[in-house]
């Protein structure tokens, strides 16, 4: 019995659970159906509202477009009316002008008819008068015409010749005056310093006691200056003064700076002299470059190779007929620029050509060839303008001048060289003689350096110990004596010294 009740309860619970699930499912379905319906109704409502909004916006845009169209149409109509009115006015003006032209044309036609009648009458009168003149003179019309032309021609030729002669004289006088004015104006604008070339530098001493130290034991220090520096050290009775003498201004400047530095340092001995000479040589190279840079800055020259700048600076230590070449080149540059300015030519190019016209003199004592040829080679090497190159080649008439600037540079060069006090031939001849001696010595095989001292009366030949032996010294000496006799004239006795010295240096650690 209990079992049956339990079974019935179990069945009843199962049926109840199944019914509950079914009812829950139906309820859930109905709820979802209502939710969907509400969503559909909401979406439908929103769609209707959007449709109304779109239609409203469309009507508004159509209305605005219609209004805009009407306004444009009205404006265009007004513009057309205005144009039409202007055309009508112009048409009326044209009609009036046409009437005026027609009236004038009629008057002109009448005037032409009147003129033709008058011309006909004048022609008749002219024929009548010509006939009377022919009868009176016994000449026909053509004969009288030829006679008149001949007389007028002779008179005109005489007058023309007179006019041409006067014009030629006036042009010659005027051109000469203009040329003089241009050159005078250019020279007035240039400030020139008058300088004379020296072959000695004076070194001031704080005390005469230093003279003995400068000479050194057995004159070793002075010999070091002569052999290594290529200069003469002159120690005389002049108080507190030592003279550095050399025709080569670069060597003289290096030796002067070396001696001044050694005096400050206090240690004066051959090794110190040699080291200081090398140091001052390097410093002088820097000074040469700075001189070149300051020169191109002074003349406002741009875009120039640094090696060419160094050569310009080197001209400071080169002379020609006693005239400093750098000062001469700057003077020629300024004169060329001033003349070019007066003539309306390229001033910058004229200044550049004037500065570089003697650039070959920076190396003519080191290489074979004239300064003109060497200068042109330098200009070509550093890509200078062809006009500049021609100025260098033609300033001594070696080549034909190809531009006005070339002629200007040649004129400026002549003015600079010919002014009073600019050049002194004696010292230049002396320098040429000394240079020739050194060239002869350096051309002998085995000779490393040659120094001409004491106006050429003392010649030092420094032999390369790796090339020439002690046995070769006599041969080198004889060769030098023979060359000097044949090529150089020096009055008095000449002492030639051949020096072969070899040093071995090592560092012990």
Swiss-Prot record:
The EC number(s) this enzyme carries: 3.1.-.-
Gene Ontology biological-process entries: mRNA catabolic process
Transmembrane region(s): 5-25
Matching PROSITE patterns: HD (PS51831)
Bilayer topology term: Single-pass membrane protein
Pfam families from the UniProt entry: HD (PF01966), KH_1 (PF00013), RNase_Y_N (PF12072)
Span of domain KH: 199-259
Function: Endoribonuclease that initiates mRNA decay.
The name this protein goes by in its record: Ribonuclease Y
Species this protein is from: Mycoplasma mycoides subsp. mycoides SC (strain CCUG 32753 / NCTC 10114 / PG1)
């Amino acid at each position: 019995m209990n079992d049956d009740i339990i079974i019935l309860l179990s069945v009843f619970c199962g049926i109840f659970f199944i019914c509950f699930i079914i009812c829950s499912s139906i309820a859930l379905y109905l709820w979802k159906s209502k939710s969907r319906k509400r969503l559909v109704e909401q979406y439908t409502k929103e769609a209707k509202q959007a449709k109304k909004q779109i239609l409203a916006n469309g009507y508004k845009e159509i209305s605005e477009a219609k209004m805009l169209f009407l306004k444009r149409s009205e404006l265009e109509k007004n513009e057309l009316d205005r144009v039409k009115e202007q055309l009508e006015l112009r048409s009326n003006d044209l009609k009036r002008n046409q009437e005026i032209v027609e009236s004038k044309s009629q008057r002109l036609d009448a005037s032409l008819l009147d003129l033709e009648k008058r011309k006909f009458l004048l022609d008749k009168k002219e024929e009548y008068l010509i006939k009377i003149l022919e009868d009176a003179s016994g000449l026909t019309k053509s004969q009288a015409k030829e006679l008149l032309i001949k007389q007028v021609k002779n008179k005109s030729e005489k007058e023309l010749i007179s006019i041409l002669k006067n014009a030629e004289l006036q042009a010659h006088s005027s051109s000469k005056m203009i040329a003089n004015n241009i050159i005078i104006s250019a020279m007035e604008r240039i400030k020139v310093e008058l300088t004379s070339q020296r072959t000695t530098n004076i070194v001031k001493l704080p005390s005469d006691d230093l003279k003995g130290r400068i000479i050194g034991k057995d004159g070793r220090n002075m010999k070091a200056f002569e052999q290594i520096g290529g200069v003469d050290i002159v120690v005389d009775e002049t108080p507190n003064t030592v003279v550095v003498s050399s025709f080569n201004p670069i060597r003289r400047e290096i030796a002067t700076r070396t001696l001044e530095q050694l005096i400050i340092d206090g240690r004066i001995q051959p090794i110190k002299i040699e080291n200081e000479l090398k140091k001052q040589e390097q410093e002088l190279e820097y000074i040469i470059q700075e001189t070149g840079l300051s020169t191109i800055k002074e003349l406002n020259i741009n875009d120039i190779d640094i090696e060419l700048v160094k050569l310009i600076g080197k001209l400071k230590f080169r002379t020609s007929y006693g005239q400093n070449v750098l000062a001469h080149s700057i003077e020629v540059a300024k004169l060329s620029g001033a003349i070019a300015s007066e003539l309306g030519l390229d001033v910058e190019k004229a200044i550049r050509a004037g500065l570089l016209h003697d650039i070959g003199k920076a190396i003519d004592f080191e290489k074979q060839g004239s300064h003109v040829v060497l200068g042109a080679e330098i200009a070509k090497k550093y890509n200078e303008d062809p006009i500049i190159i021609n100025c260098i080649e033609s300033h001594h008439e070696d080549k034909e001048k190809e531009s006005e600037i070339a002629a200007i540079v040649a004129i400026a060069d002549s003015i600079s060289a010919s002014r009073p006090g600019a050049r002194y031939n004696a010292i230049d001849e002396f320098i040429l003689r000394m240079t020739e001696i050194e060239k002869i010595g350096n051309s002998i095989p085995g000779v490393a350096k040659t120094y001409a001292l004491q106006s050429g009366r003392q010649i030092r030949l420094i032999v390369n110990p790796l090339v020439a032996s002690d046995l070769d010294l006599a041969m080198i000496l004889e060769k030098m004596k023979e060359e000097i006799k044949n090529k150089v004239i020096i009055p008095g006795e000449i002492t030639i010294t051949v020096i072969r010295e070899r040093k071995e240096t090592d560092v012990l650690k």
